[in-house]
Curated annotation (Swiss-Prot):
GO biological process terms held by the UniProt record: cell projection organization; iron-sulfur cluster assembly; regulation of non-motile cilium assembly
Record family assignment: Belongs to the Mrp/NBP35 ATP-binding proteins family. NUBP1/NBP35 subfamily.
Name of the molecule in the record: Cytosolic Fe-S cluster assembly factor NUBP1 homolog
Subcellular location: Cytoplasm; Cell projection
UniProt keyword annotations, A-Z: 4Fe-4S, ATP-binding, Cell projection, Cilium, Cilium biogenesis/degradation, Cytoplasm, Iron, Iron-sulfur, Metal-binding, Nucleotide-binding
Alphabetical list of InterPro entries matching this protein: AAA+_ATPase, Mrp-like_CS, Mrp/NBP35_ATP-bd, NUBP1/Nbp35, P-loop_NTPase, YlxH/NBP35
Native source species: Caenorhabditis briggsae
Length: 313
């Protein structure tokens, strides 16, 4: 919706709707009084810029996780490579994990710089049909901590959306921070203002402590009207690098992601194994599909990419 203020609550009905300032989602919003009297805040002048940038992006996918350390960024990078295995498709990654950007290291472009032109920021190329934008490219020292309050983080996310010159893109994967923070609310609002959002992939691990937060992530998507494409269970089992025997790594005391998806009427798109070779490839910025093309995990990522494409078309 183009009439949702930047600082509005999640689930804002829009300043021009009949429920403006009166709906349950308006409680506590700084714009509630103005909206209720028909004097809502002025329209965001950056919305048309975001709409223009995203008009050339066919599919936009959020990668979410309720908890850190479940492999969300790992999934993002390898799903992007799997989608980009089709040379006719243009794929891009937007890393909006402002305080913990890891995509540049994983994709082997940690020392690259972003170039600015009259058309905006040019994302860093990984291969001819795969590009990346991350705040890590804008920080002088990669070991410097990003200590920003919410408003500045949101401003950076907005700048990514309106100033990056992606060009024509078939699939944009957006790697988000863990949880459901202020950045997620602002990001979703900006994206919905730019047009339809294809949906979210939610990443979990099998144990209940992770699934507890996944259920909150599902609730967030429902409240913000973000479609859920499905759930990916990462580290579902361990694959021995010597004999390829698989072993359950984490307890599934409540049935794991499979049972949670069944209870929540969600689709479990993949149960990805844990392979030590992947960690080595990511640390070295290597393409896992080139170093381990016949591995169980590489095939699982390719299968996941096909399922995602089927859901989008």
């Amino acid at each position: 919706m183009s009439d949702v203020p930047e600082d509005a609550n999640a689930g804002c009905p829009g300043t021009g709707s009949a429920g403006a300032g009166k709906a349950s989602g308006c409680a506590g919003c700084p714009n509630q009084g103005a909206c209720a009297t028909g004097q809502g805040p002025p329209p965001d002048a950056d919305v048309p810029k975001i709409q223009d940038r995203f008009s050339r992006i066919k599919h936009k996918i959020l990668i979410l996780s309720g908890k850190g350390g479940v492999g969300k960024s790992t999934l993002t990078s390898n799903l992007a490579r799997a989608l980009a295995s089709d040379p006719s498709k243009q794929v891009a990654i937007l890393d909006v994990d402002i305080c913990g950007p890891s995509q540049p290291r994983m994709m082997g472009v940690e020392d690259e710089e972003v170039h600015n032109s009259a058309d905006g920021w040019t994302p860093v190329g990984i291969q001819p049909n795969l590009t990346l934008m991350s705040i890590a490219f804008l920080i002088g020292d990669k070991n410097d901590a990003v200590i920003w309050r919410g408003a500045r983080k949101n401003g950076m996310i907005k700048q990514f959306l309106k100033d990056v010159d992606w060009g024509e893109v078939d699939y944009l994967l957006i790697d988000t921070p863990p949880g459901t923070s202020d950045e997620h609310i602002s990001l979703v609002q900006f994206l919905l203002q730019a047009g339809p959002l294809d949906g979210a992939l939610i990443v979990s691990t099998p144990q209940e402590v992770s699934l507890l937060d996944v259920r909150k992530e599902v609730s967030f998507c429902i409240k913000t009207k973000v479609p859920i494409l499905g759930v990916v269970e990462n580290m579902a089992r361990f694959v021995c690098p010597n004999c390829a025997h698989t072993t359950l790594l984490f307890p599934t005391s409540t049935g794991g992601a499979e049972k949670m998806c069944e209870d929540s009427n969600l689709e479990l798109l993949a149960q990805l194994p844990l392979e030590p070779a992947l960690a080595e490839a990511l640390d070295n910025g290597e393409d896992f599909f080139e170093t381990n093309p016949d591995s169980t995990l590489a095939k699982s990522f390719m299968d996941l990419a096909e399922k995602v494409k089927a859901k989008l078309h």
